Amino acid sequence: ACGRGEYAVGLGEMFPENNFIGVDIKGNRMYLGAKKALDKQLNNIRFLRTQIEMLPDYFGKDEVDEIWITFPDPQLRTSKAKKRLTHPRFLRLYQKVLKKNGVIHLKTDSPHLFRFTKLVSDMYGISVIESCDNVYAQSEIDKTLTIKTHYESLDIAGSNKIFYIKFSLPDTLPEKDDELQELLKTTETNQEITNQ
């Protein structure tokens, strides 16, 4: 979900030769990004108001080069794990529109979502290209990671760190969703007890 569209606008400014589409269900949030893109006369940015589950209805097979997931709701409760935008349920949707070797970026302030995404990567044979548990502590930061969103500035998770992971999907994700859910019940419950 693109939220206020800061990432779409930022990437559009950095890469005027590429097209960017921000997707979110809430039109009032996207309006801010759309207005900013119009004000800056950025013709390579569009916004689509829809649910993420509907992506394959709007994009064809192999149509998307990259997907940026920036500061999504981490859905902290184990019972809501299937709503995490890096859950295999969503990764299978992304496979339908991503080009072969296309990449997915996750930038978050949630250590919980970052750990979950790494767990999913390990379990499902996903190729992690880059992973960082403190973006701004790096000596060199890729310019695409310097774009700040409204939600990043709020640091909702209170972690004072920004986590990043970039990965590409295999041709097929194994059917391990039940196994993942059972593992989450054990590990996330243990982490909650430890964190108290």
Task: Indicate residue ranges for each PLM-predicted region.
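Class I SAM-dependent methyltransferase "Motif I" SAM/SAH-binding loop
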Residues: A1-R4
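Conserved SAM/SAH-binding beta-strand->alpha-helix loop
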Residues: K26
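S-adenosyl-L-methionine
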Residues: K35-K61
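A short acidic, Gly/Pro-enriched loop at the edge of an enzyme's catalytic core
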Residues: D57-E66, F71
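A short glycine-rich, Lys/Arg-flanked "PGG" loop and its adjoining helix->strand segment in the class I
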Residues: T86-K100
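Conserved beta-strand signature within the Rossmann-like core of class I S-adenosyl-L-methionine
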Residues: N101-T108
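SAM/dcSAM-binding transferase cores
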Residues: I129-Q196
